[in-house]
């Protein structure tokens, strides 16, 4: 990656595909040797990712990126997600980019956002 803007753009486009439910668009963003890791998944490949993770896109209404830090071909993003049932959650993800494609995503689960947690965050000045 030559510019930071390109890394940010790929990360934002990745989340936008979940909002639009556009599997073709996300497939175009991922490298052939893409891997995905989370507390539930250990370096699964693209085929397993689409079987196990992509169906979750049907439950996602939106993402709100709170922080996005990048350096070279890597980025960390913290976001709040909202499901169609109104539930909210917050996660952090690490992205590694190679050749204008997303090569690796590592998800670090955080908390489900409840009304009580949102009130605590507001009092602490966190939006």
Please name every model-derived segment.
Residues 1-24, 28, 32, 116-127:
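Short, low-complexity N-terminal intrinsically disordered segments enriched in polar/charged residues
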Residues 7, 46-47:
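Generic alpha-helical secondary structure
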Residues 12-16, 32-34, 47, 77, ...:
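Intrinsically disordered, low-complexity segments enriched in small/polar residues
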Residues 37-39, 50-127:
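A beta-strand edge to alpha-helix "cap/lid" segment located at domain peripheries
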Residues 42-44:
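Acidic-and-aromatic substrate-binding clefts and catalytic sites of carbohydrate-active enzymes
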